[in-house]
Amino acid sequence: MEGFFRIPLKRANLHGMLKAAISKIKANFTAYGAPRINIEDFNIVKEGKAEILFPKKETVFYNPIQQFNRDLSVTCIKAWDNLYGEECGQKRNNKKSKKKRCAETNDDSSKRQKMGNGSPKEAVGNSNRNEPYINILEALSATGLRAIRYAHEIPHVREVIANDLLPEAVESIKRNVEYNSVENIVKPNLDDANVLMYRNKATNNKFHVIDLDPYGTVTPFVDAAIQSIEEGGLMLVTCTDLSVLAGNGYPEKCFALYGGANMVSHESTHESALRLVLNLLKQTAAKYKKTVEPLLSLSIDFYVRVFVKVKTSPIEVKNVMSSTMTTYHCSRCGSYHNQPLGRISQREGRNNKTFTKYSVAQGPPVDTKCKFCEGTYHLAGPMYAGPLHNKEFIEEVLRINKEEHRDQDDTYGTRKRIEGMLSLAKNELSDSPFYFSPNHIASVIKLQVPPLKKVVAGLGSLGFECSLTHAQPSSLKTNAPWDAIWYVMQKCDDEKKDLSKMNPNTTGYKILSAMPGWLSGTVKSEYDSKLSFAPNEQSGNIEKLRKLKIVRYQENPTKNWGPKARPNTS
């Protein structure tokens, strides 16, 4: 530091001296006690409010496609903090007198105090006792870009631990932290992520937010993260191993990593990937009498990303079995049927008091062969069966994206895509797992592909609900049974299909010729009397959403985009 302060203090303006010192650090970037760094060895990459020195040797990699992930993560942590603070405020109002009595008896020298049910920690030693703060762990930090963005862009952040197991990565984090002047917030750390989290759990120094973004599966880090997160804390989880989670092979590896089998060769495989990850989180949390609440679950490009709130709730742990399911899906026509593992019922006991009875479910819901096409059923799961999103949380994320990030496209370059994808997610049916593609069904029964609004209008006229899905373009989620789906799709064809011209061995022929067997006369008469393809509320909602000028799905942004190879550390 001697070289920066050779001007005598008597003749120097303190402000000017500090400004010159900071400028010199930025320009020459010499770490104290270390040799000068040649800035020509680095590419300076700007993302959000952070600038990182990206080594040209690529010992630590930067993937620009992941900016959407990081923009979304910043926005979601802000939304969680806002909602989290509101919950704490309500709790403080309800227990104001009790907290006042506790404050009078507490030791004023205490450094920190927890408020409410998992509220952000508050600095008791500060002049403002009600000023909240957040501690964040980025367990697998690589360059430190995400941690630096959290420090720059999220209010109330007191500390971000930027951890990595590779010494080269930690050196990169140190350079970037100092280059961005966030040394007081971002703390580079060289450690095994699990060891770090278990250590913090043992010392009761837990994190409010834990971000797990590994190369591949998140499974090895889940147990430690669940135990080291604060009550009501936010976990951000990424899995990039979609060849296992959503591919047509490796069911044994999927089961070993996630405790369930994926929907092999099925269109809904990306949603089943989300449900397998959420089931892993729920099963792990249940061992510690905790539960995870999905706030936002997205299938994005080449990975899945879920945002969950972790809290202690022995009562909700009892519901885990009934919110877990297996799925029977036909290998030929694609129809599927879900089987919950447990059931919940209300019973009347002594003194006319009701109690909750937990029991195993009855099944299976299907025969050995598909009733529509005589195809073979494959089994997927166990996996999570409940809602993927929290509507209130998504609305807060969209509000921040629209209002607080307005006119900040240079900082949040993926604002439009966040708006588009989350608008779809917010309007998804919450109680209808999986989706179907009218294009696929039309190809099965040899029909011209009908307009999406026509299919939705038909299902809506029969009294069923429909929604788009964020996971796949031109696909629908619905609470309609599969006999209604096949019926409506057949009726979408203006001309009656001549079965004599179809190959009897095809799936489409088997479905259409067997209709009297799987669609009873009573149900068919009801469908015939109700069916209409005139616009209705369901089709109107779909068309309104489709007409919005928003970016719904990712277009190929660069040549050879996608997951990068592992960094070369040799």
From Swiss-Prot:
Motif Nuclear localization signal is found at: 95-101
Q: Where are the compositionally biased (Basic residues) regions?
A: 92-101
Q: Where does S-adenosyl-L-methionine bind?
A: 70, 146, 164, 195
Q: Where does Zn(2+) bind?
A: 330, 333, 370, 373
Q: What is its EC number?
A: 2.1.1.216
Query: Basic and acidic residues: which segments have biased composition?
Result: 102-111
**Impact noted for substituting residue 467 to L:** In strain: D4; loss of activity
Keywords associated with the record: Acetylation, Membrane, Metal-binding, Methyltransferase, Mitochondrion, Nucleus, RNA-binding, S-adenosyl-L-methionine, Transferase, Transit peptide, tRNA processing, tRNA-binding, Zinc
Q: Which GO terms describe its cellular component?
A: mitochondrion; nuclear envelope; nuclear inner membrane; nucleus
Q: Name one GO biological process term.
A: tRNA N2-guanine methylation
Catalytic activity annotated for this protein? Answer: guanosine(26) in tRNA + 2 S-adenosyl-L-methionine = N(2)-dimethylguanosine(26) in tRNA + 2 S-adenosyl-L-homocysteine + 2 H(+)
Region of interest (Required and sufficient for inner nuclear membrane localization), residue spans = 133-155
Molecular function terms, GO-annotated:
tRNA (guanine(26)-N2)-dimethyltransferase activity; tRNA (guanine(26)-N2/guanine(27)-N2)-dimethyltransferase activity; tRNA binding
Supply the InterPro entries for this chain: SAM-dependent_MTases_sf, Trm1, tRNA_met_Trm1_C
Residue ranges of every copy of the Trm1 methyltransferase domain listed in the record: 43-489
Note down the stretches annotated as region Disordered.
91-128
Other remarks in the entry: Present with 15500 molecules/cell in log phase SD medium.
The Swiss-Prot or TrEMBL record describes its family as follows: Belongs to the class I-like SAM-binding methyltransferase superfamily. Trm1 family.
Name this protein carries in UniProt: tRNA (guanine(26)-N(2))-dimethyltransferase, mitochondrial
Gene assigned in the entry = TRM1
